[in-house]
Amino acid sequence: QGRPPGPPIPP
């Protein structure tokens, strides 16, 4: 929650 769904943010 707090962030829209989608692919993870790369490091």
Swiss-Prot record:
Protein's cellular compartments: Secreted
- What UniProt keywords apply to this chain's record, in alphabetical order? Hypotensive agent, Metalloenzyme inhibitor, Metalloprotease inhibitor, Protease inhibitor, Pyrrolidone carboxylic acid, Secreted, Toxin
Q: Is Signal among the key words of this record?
A: no
Main localization of the protein described in the UniProt heading: secreted
Give the CC-aspect GO terms.
extracellular region
Q: Does the keyword Membrane apply?
A: no
Gene Ontology terms for molecular function: peptidase inhibitor activity; toxin activity
Of which family is this protein a member?
Answer: Belongs to the bradykinin-potentiating peptide family.
State what this protein does. Answer: This peptide both inhibits the activity of the angiotensin-converting enzyme (ACE) and enhances the action of bradykinin by inhibiting the peptidases that inactivate it. It acts as an indirect hypotensive agent.
Annotated protein name in UniProt: Bradykinin-potentiating peptide 1
Q: Which organism is it from?
A: Gloydius halys (Chinese water mocassin)
